[in-house]
Amino acid sequence: MNFFTMCMLAAGFGMAIGAFGTGIGQGLAVKSAVEGVSRNPGASGKILTTMMIGLAMIESLAIYVLVVCLIILFANPYKDVAIKALETVAK
């Protein structure tokens, strides 16, 4: 397995796990907000505001994972070192 294949697998698995985690987190946040509004409709404004801030923070995880995956794929600072190490191991 060469270096670029490993980078593709790492980026793919990283993005999948990050998307799964943020999806679960956002689902639980919205579920709790809907339950809160159904119990106390008068507080829907505060609940909605808090939920939106929470969703933005949860979504930032997916953005960070995307940035790390793009760095792994296109701007990997250890590319030359890893390629030399893999060539040495292959010999």
Curated annotation (Swiss-Prot):
One of its GO terms (molecular function) is proton-transporting ATP synthase activity, rotational mechanism. GO terms for cellular component: plasma membrane; proton-transporting ATP synthase complex; proton-transporting two-sector ATPase complex, proton-transporting domain. It is a multi-pass membrane protein. The keyword Protein transport does not apply. It is found in: Cell inner membrane. It holds the Pfam family ATP-synt_C. The record marks 59 as: Reversibly protonated during proton transport. The chain crosses the membrane at residues 4-24, 53-73. Keywords: ATP synthesis, Cell inner membrane, Cell membrane, CF(0), Hydrogen ion transport, Ion transport, Lipid-binding, Membrane, Transmembrane, Transmembrane helix, Transport. The keyword Ubl conjugation does not apply. CDD domains: ATP-synt_Fo_c. F(1)F(0) ATP synthase produces ATP from ADP in the presence of a proton or sodium gradient. F-type ATPases consist of two structural domains, F(1) containing the extramembraneous catalytic core and F(0) containing the membrane proton channel, linked together by a central stalk and a peripheral stalk. During catalysis, ATP synthesis in the catalytic domain of F(1) is coupled via a rotary mechanism of the central stalk subunits to proton translocation. F-type ATPases have 2 components, F(1) - the catalytic core - and F(0) - the membrane proton channel. F(1) has five subunits: alpha(3), beta(3), gamma(1), delta(1), epsilon(1). F(0) has three main subunits: a(1), b(2) and c(10-14). The alpha and beta chains form an alternating ring which encloses part of the gamma chain. F(1) is attached to F(0) by a central stalk formed by the gamma and epsilon chains, while a peripheral stalk is formed by the delta and b chains. Belongs to the ATPase C chain family. This is ATP synthase subunit c. It comes from Trichlorobacter lovleyi (strain ATCC BAA-1151 / DSM 17278 / SZ) (Geobacter lovleyi).
